């Protein structure tokens, strides 16, 4: 009899907890807004993650918004070739075909052509494509870590046949890869599992960080994004500082800040696709001279994870790490679903459930 009563009590307790949990989720949906803060150094991929959240949970981009992105894509395409030409000069490389010098001069003087452009100018597109097909330009791209080459350069420059068409409309991938510097605060709102989320992206370059303080109050979780592929690159705003080291310094200050003692900390080691290619050519020793492991993806990535984890001064705080490719919508969806589930559970536990 006692055993039967115990089993009944257990079942009643489980039902009670399930009801409590459902009531709390309903309560959260009515009164609780979960605030997420996206942090990271400049060009780590925060804005791309935010765009993915819009695609996955906020109905994506309207036709009007896609149309507005055309000018960004046009400028990114021109900026990509301009950066490569500056890189060629810095590396003292010459064109395979000397006639390309005329195209280079034309491109470097063409920024005003895009100011009001509704269609990518044909003459400019032809010059960029001629340069893109030059063997020396392809060799410079392989040395992109030695100068400030946009990571989207190969995508946009190889897509000019499509981008220059009169009826061109940016694809989802074009929008994900397009970039303008984030200044101030960008917000995305969405609802998932009956919970309202507000996600903030703030400027990652040094001059923007003083503005982060306005986002700090009542933050439920931080998604810190570090570009794992940038271990051999320097900052845009300070070419004496390694990007990976800067990212680790920033992570340490955020992770151990008094503002975030009770805040869930999620680390996205982003651009894993670029890291996988780069590690075949260049060891992480450029950022970590003490590294003794093999020049492989798994071992190098594990070492970097341990480095970040070691920056956490609170033994009771767990850093939830994920290796990500922010431009891969399917992978981002899987990781974001896992992260959001974890955040919801953490909030329920915080309410005693």
Swiss-Prot record:
GO CC entries: axon; cytoplasm; heterotrimeric G-protein complex; neuronal cell body; non-motile cilium
Keyword presence, Magnesium: yes
InterPro entries: Gprotein_alpha_I, Gprotein_alpha_su, GproteinA_insert, P-loop_NTPase
Protein name (Swiss-Prot/TrEMBL): Guanine nucleotide-binding protein alpha-3 subunit
Region (G1 motif): 35-48
Region (G3 motif): 197-206
Keywords: GTP-binding, Lipoprotein, Magnesium, Metal-binding, Myristate, Nucleotide-binding, Palmitate, Transducer
């Amino acid at each position: 009899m006692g055993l039967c009563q115990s089993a009944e009590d257990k079942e009643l307790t489980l039902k009670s907890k399930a009801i409590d949990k459902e009531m709390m989720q309903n309560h959260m949906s009515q009164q609780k807004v979960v605030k997420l803060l996206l942090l990271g150094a400049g060009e780590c991929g925060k804005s791309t993650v935010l765009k993915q959240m819009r695609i996955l949970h906020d109905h994506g981009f309207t036709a009007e918004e896609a149309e507005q992105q055309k000018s960004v894509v046009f400028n990114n395409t021109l900026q990509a070739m301009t950066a490569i030409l500056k890189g060629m000069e810095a590396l003292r490389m010459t064109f395979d075909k000397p006639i390309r010098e005329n195209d280079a001069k034309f491109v470097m003087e063409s920024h005003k052509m895009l100011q009001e452009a509704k269609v990518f100018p044909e003459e400019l597109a032809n010059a960029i494509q001629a340069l893109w097909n030059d063997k020396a330009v392809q060799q410079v791209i392989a040395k992109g870590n030695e100068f400030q080459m946009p990571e989207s350069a190969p995508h946009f420059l190889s897509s000019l046949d499509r981008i220059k068409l009169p009826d061109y409309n940016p694809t989802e991938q074009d929008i994900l890869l397009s970039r303008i510097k984030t200044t101030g605060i960008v917000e995305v709102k969405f609802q998932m599992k009956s919970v309202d989320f507000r996600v903030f992206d703030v400027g990652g370059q040094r001059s923007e960080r003083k503005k982060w303080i306005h986002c700090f109050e009542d933050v439920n979780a931080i998604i810190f994004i570090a570009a794992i592929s940038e271990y051999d690159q320097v900052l845009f705003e300070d070419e004496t500082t390694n990007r990976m080291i800067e990212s680790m310094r920033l992570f340490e200050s955020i992770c151990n800040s008094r503002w975030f003692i009770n805040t869930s900390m999620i680390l996205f080691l982003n651009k894993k696709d670029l890291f996988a290619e780069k590690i075949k050519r260049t060891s992480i020793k450029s950022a970590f001279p003490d590294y003794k492991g093999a020049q492989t993806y798994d071992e190098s990535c594990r070492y970097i994870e341990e480095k970040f984890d070691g920056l956490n001064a609170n033994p009771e705080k767990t850093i939830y790490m994920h290796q990500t490719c922010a431009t891969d919508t399917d992978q981002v969806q899987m990781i974001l679903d896992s992260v959001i589930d974890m955040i919801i559970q953490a909030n329920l536990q915080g309410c005693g459930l």
